[in-house]
Every structure is written in C-alpha cells, then in structure tokens.
Amino acid sequence: MKFLIAIKNTKKESKNILEIGCKIAEGFSADLTICYIGKQSKALIEGDVNLARKTLSEWNIHHPGLEVLEWAFNILKEKGFAPNSDFDVDNLVEEKGRIRMVLSKTTNYQIGLVLREGDLLSELNKEVKHSDFDIVIMGSPHRKRMINKISQFLDTSIFFVKNFNPNWNYKILLCVDDSRATKRAVILSTRISKQFDAEITSLTVSKTSLFGKGYRNAHIWAERYLQRIGIPFNSKLVSGNPVEVFVNEAGEDHIIIMGKAKGNEFLKFIWGSKPIHTAQRANCPVLLVN
C-alpha cells in the first residue's frame, strides 16, 4: 500500500499528524510519502532552478517547504523510517509541477519527500493521481466546506487528523451501514486496531427503529469478520440521527472509521453526506474509506 501524509508547517499539529501517520503506515508496511504544498513561488513558475548548484540555505530562501520536509524527515528517522538515509539537496529531482527527493530503500517500504506549490486541493489531487495513493493523511481543515471538497474530489481514502493526542489510548468506532465501502472499512479497522492495541465498537445506526435488510446484513458481516480475525470488539444497533450518534459515541478518544457514501456526486457536493458531516462535526480523527 501507499500512504501520503500532507503537512503544512513544523508546528505541534503537524508533528501529531506525522505521529499517527507513521504508526498506521507501519502496521501496513506501506510506502510513505510526505508532501508539503506551499504558495507558488516565482522561481518554480519560471523553472529558474538548478538543483546541482543550489546549497541548502539557498533552497530554503526560495523554497521554505524544504525546511518543513527536512524537519519531517528527521522525525521519520526518529521513528525508525529510512534509518540510513540523509536529507541531501543533491538528491532533489525536479519533475513537472513537483520536486521530490530520491531516497534509498533501506527497509521493506519506500520513503518519499515531495514539494508542490499552488492550490491545496488541486495539488493534492495531482499528487494522488500521480502516485495512486491508498490513503491520504492530513489535518482536518477548519472550514467545513473544505472537508466536503477534499472528501468529494480526492478519489482515495482520507484520514482527517483532528485533536490527536499521541499519549491517549485510542479506541476504534467502526460505523457500519450498507454502503459499498463498508467492507473495506471493516478490513482496514482491524489492521489499525492491532497497531493501536485498540478495542473496536461496531456501530450501525438507523434513523428509525426498523433496520433494513442491507443494514442488518452489513452489521452481521462485520461481526463475523471481526470474530474471525480475533479482534476484541462490541457491537451495537442504535436508532437515532446517525451523525449525532457517531459524534457523541466517539467523543475525543476514538478513531472513527467509516466508508465513503454512495450516491449522486453532485448532490453530495451540495448537501454533503453522512460520512462528510461526521468528519465535519467529530472531535477526533476520522478515516473515510474509499
């Protein structure tokens, strides 16, 4: 698998995003790319870069994102990723619309560092298409509309990291319904559960007291799969407003995992969807599975 971690600075929030991203990637033995997307600089627009002649200080003047990537790289080394690699600007390669650092593969997974410039959503979308990432891990945008846009336009799973505290013992809230991505969400939840040594709560919520065949079948399938894998879990069928139940049940000490919604893409963009509203309102990390 291939994971992308998007960071914007060297602050505590970005460090927490790296913490949880590294831990999850380790559980999947996934290739890991750290991507910084900054404002567009005149130098990159004009192609006025000569990688062989630039010193690190010169690069940092024109591309402050390299300082962020070096900071992130050092954290990766602390976590045991790329232990024998060095941050060396001589290994920078300029490609169309992006700059990446070539790192040797010293473990069973590959580490990458990428610098892009321009609109966040547009550049994220280009990077996802360029490398076909399975999961994008990023901070949760403050604007709800941006969460909607990112969820809709990135054709991959998205992990919004919100209020993550590396010192907490997180549990997993697995939201189960009849959406086509639910089974994949269940499967991913077991891998993440093992990494965090976290118990899973499998939760199916119906707006009425009646649970349709699709909901019941999905709930039963999730129970059977979790039993087969041997993950500690409890299972709930609850009536109520799904988003409110998910958010209240999760609180701040859960990682919510749920499938992306099916249905009309235009209507989802205008009105949102159950997973999008959950990601917007939750006070904890949320993984929307594609």
Feature map (PLM): residue ranges:
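Gly/Ser-rich helix-loop-strand patches that form or flank binding pockets
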Residues: 13, 18-20, 25, 113-166, ...
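Structural beta-alpha unit
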Residues: 59, 74-136, 228-266, 284
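Short boundary motifs at domain starts and secondary-structure transition points
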Residues: 101-105, 161-168
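Short secondary-structure capping/turn micro-motifs that flank functional sites
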Residues: 41-42, 92-93, 144, 167, ...
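Structured core of small recognition/catalytic domains
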Residues: 202-204, 211-254, 266, 272-273, ...
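N-terminal membrane-insertion helices
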Residues: 61, 65-76, 219
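Aromatic/hydrophobic pocket-lining residues that form π-stacking "cages" and hydrophobic walls in ligand
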Residues: 21, 72, 124, 189, ...
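Small/aliphatic-rich secondary-structure junction motif
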Residues: 1-62, 170-236
